[in-house]
């Protein structure tokens, strides 16, 4: 068995004295593991850093085997990603999100989105918006997609201001007004018009929105907690937009 694909390094684990087991997100074969011989060598360690884009060749006798990777560098961005807290936490948080999906399950659109986000993690506003959209895409692929295109009550496609916590569907400002205190806010940049830039308030609302549904549909049923890196990313992105912001008291303030 052999195949070749574009991939992004998610992480590595030591295996023996000189080798590692690499975890990558491939474009056409999803999240995949493989042994990299001499992966701890001076030549390979800089290549096998989270966030780097590589070309991998996977070989194994049978498809169900772990197999071996041969890895060639394409874009070595890991050093740059270590320069800001937003980038450091962002790489870790996206890896944790991808681990919610079955191994070897192809999600080419998530691979493409991951590459875009990795190139924008230096800009907190762009990174925050792209990260929220990435979380929405993961929710959708897990079968829990939100419907933000029209009002659940009236069918209206304008002035959408809320999201029902029960149905995950958008609600217009007028239809949702009587229950506004029980609704989740729909950030303008996620609306169907899509002509609003993300700012501190809208990103705060967006992180609450995706955090709520990830907790309800994924983390709670599986008996797991959200990755600490998600809270770190949220904190770093919002603090970059508002340097006067104090450290939030906990993940429930924004993340869920």
Swiss-Prot record:
GO biological process, one term: DNA recombination
Key words, A-Z: DNA damage, DNA recombination, DNA repair
Cross-referenced SUPFAM superfamilies: ArfGap/RecO-like zinc finger, Nucleic acid-binding proteins
Pfam family, one: RecO_C
Transmembrane domains' residue ranges: none
One Gene Ontology CC term in the entry: bacterial nucleoid
PANTHER family: DNA REPAIR PROTEIN RECO
Homology family: Belongs to the RecO family.
Function statement: Involved in DNA repair and RecF pathway recombination.
Entry protein name: DNA repair protein RecO
